[in-house]
């Protein structure tokens, strides 16, 4: 099921996780659910009136089973570059494996057993890169290569799992699902300082905020 939360911004509800469709310079898929969410992604795009083949790029906030899971299943109809950052991009390419010495790395290794790697072009992202109207901000902690994307033009922030939503407020990624909670807190503070104003906060878990997203991020940052 897809819901338009702002002009040109659609939430693709995959049950326990969100993906998004953003009409930027090209139709842009943001994250891709779990390996079991192919039907939800396809159905959500159909609800929004977009063919899978029309997707011009994929923006990944990070590598996790519930954010990259359908990419392999969506090809070859999906034929678009996938933008990902650093270590997470290396995981998606199959060049690296998550470290066993970190509890989150172990979770990722287990998730990798049921997650196929996509045969798609993986484009490395760097902090400050402009991708369409979005700017990439490296926000490590939940994963080493977690990245948020903010479009000043659209007033939209794609926050992935840096934060989640609960009762209309943003909450930082917790220890159980993060590599480094100290880095999470630093990333929240940094993004709150660096990002331009935005209304819409698209989160991986919970409900997206349709207004006041930047204010909610600053409120959270002030507590960390």
PLM region descriptions:
Residues 2-48, 148-165:
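Conserved beta-strand hairpin/beta-sheet module of binuclear metal-dependent hydrolase folds
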Residues 38-84:
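Active-site metal-binding motif and surrounding structural segment of the metallo-beta-lactamase
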Residues 79-86, 103-105, 158-160:
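Short hydrophobic/aromatic-enriched beta-strand-loop microsegments
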Residues 35-36, 87-138, 144-216:
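Metallo-beta-lactamase
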Residues 1, 219-221:
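Terminal disorder- and signal-encoded targeting elements
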Residues 27-58, 103, 108-120:
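Pre-active-site segment of Zn-dependent metallo-hydrolases
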Residues 28-30, 59, 82, 156-158, ...:
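Residue-level marker for buried hydrophobic side chains located in beta-strands
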């Amino acid at each position: 099921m897809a819901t338009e939360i702002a002009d040109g911004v659609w939430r693709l509800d995959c049950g326990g996780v969100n993906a998004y469709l953003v009409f930027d310079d090209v139709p842009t898929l943001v994250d891709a659910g779990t390996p079991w969410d192919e039907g939800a992604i396809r159905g959500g795009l159909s609800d929004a009136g977009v063919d899978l083949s029309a997707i011009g790029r994929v923006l990944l906030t990070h590598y996790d089973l519930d954010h990259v899971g359908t990419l392999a299943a969506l090809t070859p109809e999906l034929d678009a570059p996938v933008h990902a950052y650093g270590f997470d991009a290396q995981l998606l390419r199959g060049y690296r494996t998550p470290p066993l010495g970190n509890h989150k790395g172990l979770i990722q290794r287990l998730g990798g057993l049921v997650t196929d790697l996509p045969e798609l072009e993986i484009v490395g992202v760097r902090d400050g890169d402009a991708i369409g109207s979005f700017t990439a901000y490296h926000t490590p902690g939940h994963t080493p290569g977690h990245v948020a994307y903010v479009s000043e033009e659209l007033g939209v922030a794609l926050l992935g799992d840096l934060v989640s939503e609960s009762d209309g407020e943003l909450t930082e990624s917790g220890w159980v699902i993060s590599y480094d909670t100290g880095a999470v807190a630093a990333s929240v503070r940094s993004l709150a300082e660096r990002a331009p104003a935005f209304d819409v906060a698209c989160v991986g878990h919970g409900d997206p905020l349709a207004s006041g997203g930047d204010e909610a991020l600053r409120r959270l940052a002030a507590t960390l």
